[in-house]
């Protein structure tokens, strides 16, 4: 009864927020309000500023660095003195070595929490645009295939997985906020800035994947940001370089653009990022542009109707509103620095992302930061405000409460209580960032996205033989190693027969058939010299990648050159495969190809391949675009094909740079086939790994451990390879078996050298006592069992075994000795036959002897294995 009442009390407490003692715990919002009540005006303003330091730094003494990857004293003082609330980090701030990134974020947080510089000492929100795909910042992390690729996979679990990987790596280096996911609906095929960053042109698909991505990132307690509100997908101008305008009505926005944002709000996104886009059919406000000397419809970032009335009022968002960079031309061309930031706050913005151009010196603090803070103070305190712009202190308080509530929600406010050392934080980063498990997950996600648009005569997956000669071709040399990686992985999967060969062609401009190759390499890494036609005549299969970022690219050499080469090979009866490497709208350009594949992404980052292609496929310091490699793996049959187009493919109007309304391939189109690689049996490998991982060096003598140093290093190397093999997808059984055998052999070699540090004194004494007994004093059966136990004990005494086996031998010997029966003390025979059968003389003794015999037999089996077991660590 009492336990039932306690359970009821606990349930009521959970619902009401009351502790068992009856004192209600403070909510995060209440904690935030308590802090805000004690903050100065300048401290509150500081919380609304997000600075960047991506352009290097020049110190007051004239020394400079080209990239801020570690904190310096001047940045430290600025962060702490002006109570800066947030810092955004870019690729220029991230070192390929994750431990260096930890030093930077740790230093930034120490500056923010330095009580000698400010009494509130509020930790920073440290953010980055780690979307995945073509937008990622961690140069040593896992790039992932990107949103459109995730949408093509058709499985929202893939978005959750991608979000978890991204969140884990950001958290590991001390970044607590991600400016992702991109929730834009890519309903304009010629969008110059969103494209692959969007999950789909279908609002519902985009909404489902947006919510899933948010869930994944937040599992790692990293804040999320749905962007770019109220939608950047239907533009033909990049707001980085201009001010786009969308003529949609509010009803049309609700039908399309707002669907993913409402889903993000419902999923609990921490932040929403604004778009520098005009919506003249929705916004009735007019702002005066001081730089253009005209009245204009404000971009969404500066529209109170968009941010306060629509986003907060109608859609119910109560989280943090953050701007896109306030240095982008979409706002910077129309308003001066102070104006545009104050107007954004007046519209309802909480955090100003990069309010002025990147800070790169102490002078920037004096010429940019201080004047902006002064302008805010003026706008909040003076009747006429700053240049006529007035701001509400009540709204400021509510804004800072939202910011601090988010910081509480994501554990940022708890950083002062983090007792981990810097070295402990670095160890986490080394383990997580760019880990094998993350990159193998990235590989699987990328393969799941690959979409086979055409597959004439079931050419794919390619069935290579010893005479196959594959020519891989693309526009950029950065793709060369991606082709190599896919080939080597297929080889490890057992798909490349002896004699099959490949070459790689790179053409970085228009080049004709008889022209000398721009650049080409043979499979052994040497350069190929000759013409394009020489290569095309050599191959039996052409796999050519095309790459467009806008409609007009379809008329350029990046498409027309692949068309020329494909058509030439088709004329000779060769097999041809076209790969759409970037935005998928060029899949329509290769009607002559036997097969067409879309992979949804590429970046300029190179790829460093190590000698180990299974598991440790990439150097530890390289993030790279995985899409092309995944596409070739699907083409070669390492993975099956399952992706579907997440966007409609409208027909391109040649020479115009535009698309028509005709759909060539509809959203959802995609052909499927199975992998050519059966899943290997990894059970023996798993067992070998478990045995190696269970090895406890403290059980062995110090001298033997020292003597076995080289063998131990060799075993650990084999163990790491085995662990990678265990995680690696699509390997041939022979590769798995080789890894298993290598680990077992090195484990055996190590165990030959290690000597167990055991106490055998009790066993030795027991043996001495047992040796004093005489066989003629005991019954034959019990003596036989005792003699066997004694022999086993002697074997263990001389063998290199662990303490558990020593103790077991001692106990077996004691048990056998206790079971000895003196001659003449046997139970008398029963002269009468027992009911149901013949009388069995010495039945009791026989039973006892049988029991001891079983015990002896069991230990005999154990002892017989001593010489084997002492070479292999027992498995707990």
Predicted regions and their residues:
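Short, hydrophobic alpha-helical membrane anchors of single-pass surface/secreted proteins
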Residues: 2, 846-858
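Sec-dependent signal peptide cleavage junction
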Residues: 12-27, 840-851
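Preference for extracellular/luminal or secreted protein segments
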Residues: 25-77, 83, 313, 334-691, ...
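Second-shell residues forming the walls of enzyme active-site clefts
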Residues: 37-40, 63-66, 71-74, 96-120, ...
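Hydrophobic faces of well-ordered beta-strands that scaffold small-molecule active sites
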Residues: 46-53, 85-89, 124-130, 177-181, ...
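Short glycine-enriched loops at secondary-structure junctions
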Residues: 54-55, 126-135, 176-186, 226-232, ...
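Catalytic domains of carbohydrate-active enzymes, especially glycoside hydrolases
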Residues: 73-90, 164-178
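C-terminal membrane-anchoring or membrane-association module
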Residues: 860-876
């Amino acid at each position: 009864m009492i336990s039932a009442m306690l359970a009821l009390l606990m349930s009521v407490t959970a619902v009401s927020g009351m502790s068992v003692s009856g004192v209600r715990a403070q909510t995060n919002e209440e904690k935030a309000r308590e802090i805000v009540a004690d903050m100065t005006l300048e401290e509150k303003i500081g919380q609304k500023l997000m600075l960047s330091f991506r352009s290097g730094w020049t110190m007051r003494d004239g020394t400079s660095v080209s990239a801020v990857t570690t904190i310096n004293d001047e940045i430290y003082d600025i962060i702490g003195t002006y109570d800066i609330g947030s810092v955004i980090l870019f690729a220029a701030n991230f070192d390929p070595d994750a431990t260096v990134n930890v030093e930077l974020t740790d230093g930034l947080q120490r500056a923010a929490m330095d009580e000698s510089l400010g009494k509130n000492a509020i930790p920073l929100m440290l953010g980055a645009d780690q979307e995945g795909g073509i937008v990622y910042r961690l140069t040593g992390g896992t790039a992932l295939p990107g949103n459109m690729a995730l949408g093509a996979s058709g499985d929202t679990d893939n978005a959750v997985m991608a979000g978890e990987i991204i969140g884990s790596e950001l958290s590991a280096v001390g970044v607590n906020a991600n400016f992702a996911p991109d929730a834009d609906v890519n309903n304009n095929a010629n969008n110059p800035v969103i494209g692959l960053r969007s999950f789909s042109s279908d609002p519902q698909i985009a909404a489902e994947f947006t919510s899933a991505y948010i869930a994944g990132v937040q599992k790692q307690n990293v804040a999320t940001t749905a962007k770019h509100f109220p939608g950047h997908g239907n533009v033909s101008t990049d707001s980085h370089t201009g001010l786009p305008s969308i003529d949609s009505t509010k009803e049309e926005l609700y039908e399309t653009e707002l669907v993913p944002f409402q889903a993000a709000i419902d999923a609990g996104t921490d932040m929403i990022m604004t778009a520098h886009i005009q919506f003249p059919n929705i916004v009735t406000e007019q702002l005066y542009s001081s730089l253009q000397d005209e009245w204009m419809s404000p971009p969404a970032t500066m529209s109170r109707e968009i941010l306060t009335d629509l986003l907060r009022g109608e859609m119910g968002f109560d989280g943090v509103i953050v701007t896109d960079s306030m240095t982008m031309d979409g706002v910077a061309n129309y308003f001066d620095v102070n104006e545009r930031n104050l107007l954004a706050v007046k519209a309802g913005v909480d955090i100003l992302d990069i309010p002025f151009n990147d800070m790169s010196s102490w002078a920037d603090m004096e010429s940019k930061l201080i004047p902006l803070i002064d302008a805010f103070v003026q706008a909040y305190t003076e009747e006429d405000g700053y240049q006529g712009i007035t701001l509400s202190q009540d709204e400021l308080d509510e804004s800072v409460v939202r910011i601090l509530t988010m910081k509480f929600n994501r554990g940022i406010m708890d950083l002062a209580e983090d007792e981990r050392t810097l070295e402990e934080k670095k160890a986490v980063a080394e383990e997580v960032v760019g880990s094998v498990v993350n990159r193998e997950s990235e590989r699987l996600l990328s393969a799941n996205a690959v979409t086979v648009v055409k597959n004439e005569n079931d050419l794919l997956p390619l069935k290579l033989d010893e005479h196959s000669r594959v020519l891989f071709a693309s526009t950029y040399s950065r793709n060369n190693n991606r082709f190599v990686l896919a080939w080597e992985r297929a080889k490890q999967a057992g798909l490349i027969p002896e004699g099959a060969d490949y070459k790689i062609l790179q053409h970085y401009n228009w080049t004709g058939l008889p022209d000398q190759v721009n650049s080409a390499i043979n499979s052994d890494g040497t350069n190929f010299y000759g013409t394009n036609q020489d290569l095309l005549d050599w191959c039996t299969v052409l796999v050519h990648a095309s790459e467009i970022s806008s409609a007009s690219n379809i008329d350029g050499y990046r498409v027309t050159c692949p068309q020329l080469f494909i058509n030439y090979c088709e004329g000779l009866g060769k097999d041809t495969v076209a790969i759409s490497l970037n935005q998928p709208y060029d899949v329509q350009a290769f009607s002559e190809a036997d097969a067409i594949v879309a992979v949804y992404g590429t970046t300029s980052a190179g790829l460093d391949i190590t000698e180990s292609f299974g598991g440790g496929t990439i150097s530890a310091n390289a993030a790279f675009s995985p899409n092309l490699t995944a596409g070739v793996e699907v083409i070669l049959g390492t993975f099956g094909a399952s992706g579907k187009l997440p966007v409609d493919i409208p027909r391109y109007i040649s020479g115009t740079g535009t698309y028509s309304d005709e759909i060539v391939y509809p959203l959802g189109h995609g052909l499927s086939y199975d992998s050519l690689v059966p899943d290997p049996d990894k059970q023996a490998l798993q067992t070998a790994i478990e045995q190696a991982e269970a090895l406890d060096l403290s059980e062995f003598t110090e001298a033997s451990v020292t003597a076995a140093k080289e063998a131990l290093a060799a075993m650990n190397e084999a163990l790491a390879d085995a662990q990678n093999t265990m995680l690696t997808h699509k390997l041939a059984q022979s590769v798995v078996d080789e890894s298993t055998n290598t680990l077992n052999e090195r484990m055996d070699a190590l165990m030959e050298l290690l000597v167990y540090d055991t106490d055998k004194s009790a066993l030795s004494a027991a043996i001495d006592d047992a040796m004093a007994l005489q066989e003629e004093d005991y019954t034959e059966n019990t003596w036989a069992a005792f003699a066997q136990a004694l022999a086993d004990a002697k074997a263990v005494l001389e063998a290199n075994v662990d303490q558990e086996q020593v103790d077991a031998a001692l106990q077996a010997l004691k048990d056998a000795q206790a079971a000895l029966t003196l001659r003449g003390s046997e139970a008398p025979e029963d002269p009468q036959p027992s009911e149901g059968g013949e009388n069995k003389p010495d039945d009791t003794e026989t039973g006892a002897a049988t029991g001891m015999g079983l015990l002896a037999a069991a230990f005999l089996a154990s002892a017989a294995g001593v010489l084997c077991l002492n070479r292999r660590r027992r498995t707990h």
